[in-house]
Amino acid sequence: SGKPVLHYFNVQGRMESIRWLLAAAGVEFEEKLIMCQEDLDKLKNDGLLMFQQVPMVEMDGMKMVQSRAILNYIATKYNLYGKDTKERLLIDMYTEGMTDLYELFFKVILAPPEEKDAAKSLIKDRAKNRFLPAFEKVLKSHGQGYLVGNKLSKADILLTELLYMVEEFDASLLANFTLLQALKTRVSNLPNVKKFLQPGSQRKPFPTQEMFEEMRKF
């Protein structure tokens, strides 16, 4: 049924985790980037966006929307979603926690200038004292190379994506979390992920405030 087609802006945003997951699963995909208002209007007018918003992924004969639903479909299809309901619960719990931290990065971009420092301080505090210790503890108590079971899952891939984001924001935040550093290295060295991390891949830049302002006009 051909390659999946991803419809989104030329930034990370809510599509980047989908790009990571497809890449890790070894699935080649195409992108139709939304570069102007007309591109988005066409998708809407053609009735392709259920809720009039992106991301949207064309895959297996479907027009899929809502990023978490898309991620769950891909994870299920490519056996990255645990072996039973208990493992799926853990994967969901962990990825929802990642989303909570991920959302704080968007708040920094959207914060007015006088609130940016406070928003950055909040990320540092939450990363260092809440989220990263929780994931480090999971790896330590689980005693395996991965977060759930002894097998790569959606949770490991999305955590690796998040760790790159944290590192780019402030590398010192990862200093005390040796198991998270090891997980990041392990996942990054998987052949499909390694390829995705090379320059010239379909990875996207983290959005600047200017990019966000442009996208919000649409």
Curated annotation (Swiss-Prot):
GST N-terminal domain: from which residue to which, for each copy? 2-82
Q: Which residues are glutathione-binding?
A: 8, 44, 53-54, 66-67
Location in or out of the cell: Cytoplasm
User: Its principal location?
Assistant: cytoplasm
Question: Which key words tag this protein in UniProt?
Answer: Acetylation, Cytoplasm, Transferase
Residue positions where N6-succinyllysine is found in the record: 3
| PROSITE patterns reported in the protein's UniProt record | GST_CTER (PS50405), GST_NTER (PS50404)
Please give the catalytic activity noted in the UniProt record: RX + glutathione = an S-substituted glutathione + a halide anion + H(+); prostaglandin A2 + glutathione = prostaglandin A2-S-(R)-glutathione; prostaglandin J2 + glutathione = prostaglandin J2-S-(R)-glutathione; (13S)-hydroperoxy-(9Z,11E)-octadecadienoate + 2 glutathione = (13S)-hydroxy-(9Z,11E)-octadecadienoate + glutathione disulfide + H2O
Which E.C. number(s) belong to this protein?
2.5.1.18
Which Gene Ontology MF annotations are present?
Answer: glutathione transferase activity
GST C-terminal domain location: 84-206
User: Biological process (GO) annotations?
Assistant: glutathione metabolic process; xenobiotic metabolic process
| Keyword flag Transferase | yes
Q: According to the UniProt entry, which residues carry N-acetylserine? A: 1
GO cellular component terms, A-Z: cytosol; extracellular exosome
Q: How does it assemble?
A: Homodimer or heterodimer of GSTA1 and GSTA2.
Q: What does this gene product do?
A: Glutathione S-transferase that catalyzes the nucleophilic attack of the sulfur atom of glutathione on the electrophilic groups of a wide range of exogenous and endogenous compounds. Involved in the formation of glutathione conjugates of both prostaglandin A2 (PGA2) and prostaglandin J2 (PGJ2). It also catalyzes the isomerization of D5-androstene-3,17-dione (AD) into D4-androstene-3,17-dione and may therefore play an important role in hormone biosynthesis.
Which family is it part of?
Belongs to the GST superfamily. Alpha family.
Write the protein's name.
Glutathione S-transferase A
